[in-house]
């Protein structure tokens, strides 16, 4: 008979503890993500245009903008423009 009183109370306590732990986990995850974004200078998830996910999309038709970090890269390859014209294929 005592179990009919204790079981509903325990289920309410477990429900509250579960929701509080989920809320704390969510808050801690948001804080960790915020700190990682603040510390990481090469974050791809950013509001800045030259560090967004669209800038590394290979199917995007627009030309990528050059960033300050890419200008410091000593291994960066310069893109050569293809010459257009009738004799450009023969004479380079």
Swiss-Prot record:
InterPro entries per UniProt: Swinepox_virus_C2
Organism domain of life: Viruses
Function: Homolog of shope fibroma virus T4A ORF.
Record's protein name: Uncharacterized protein C2
Species of provenance: Swinepox virus (strain Kasza)
Classification lineage: Viruses, Varidnaviria, Bamfordvirae, Nucleocytoviricota, Pokkesviricetes
């Amino acid at each position: 008979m005592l179990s009919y009183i204790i079981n509903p109370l325990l289920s309410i306590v477990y429900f509250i503890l579960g929701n509080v732990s989920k809320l704390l986990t969510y808050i801690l995850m948001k804080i960790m993500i915020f700190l990682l974004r603040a510390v990481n200078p090469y974050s791809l998830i950013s509001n800045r245009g030259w560090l967004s996910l669209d800038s590394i999309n290979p199917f995007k038709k627009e030309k990528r903008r050059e960033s300050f970090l890419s200008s410091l890269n000593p291994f960066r390859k310069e893109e050569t423009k293809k010459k257009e014209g009738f004799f450009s294929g023969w004479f380079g």
